Amino acid sequence: MPISSQRSTLRLLLVGLLACLLPSLASADDAAKRLRIGITLHPYYSYVANIVGDKAEVVPLIPAGFNPHAYEPRAEDIKRISGLDVIVLNGVGHDDFADRMIAASEKPNVPVIEANENVPLLAATGVAARGAGKVVNPHTFLSISASIAQVNNIARELGKLDPDNARTY
């Protein structure tokens, strides 16, 4: 085989190899840029996961199966915050443990999105609620209209933190 033919074959192989490698390098770079979003309660996991799709990673702050009403932060859960870009909170009393976790973490200034910001709230009722000093019912995710408002709040705020994907959110 003549040398010029070998060079042409080698160039063709190199171009093919680069064509195969470049997309994987780009996707690795995209994965490195994805937001890591912490959530405190399962409804917010569902909301956020559906908002971001494959554009971000959703990370529960507490392990599955824990009761958020009685949860006490563990060291490994607090440590998880250092790898997050933002945390989505209920913000009206259902996940008060998260404030203590964030304050004790290596990243106490991590941005926080309060899902219930500007969402009409229901007054807490019953002896247990009044005895616990609750003013509003924190189970806002049980209301369809409140859930819709929360999803819109979360999507809007994530769009501000991740403008490249704001249209997706």
Regions found by a protein language model. Give the residues of each.
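General N-terminal leader/first-domain-start detector
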Residues: 1-2, 25
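Bacterial N-terminal signal peptides that target proteins for export
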Residues: 2-14
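Bacterial N-terminal signal peptides
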Residues: 11-24
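Extracytoplasmic metal-acquisition and chelation regions
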Residues: 27-168
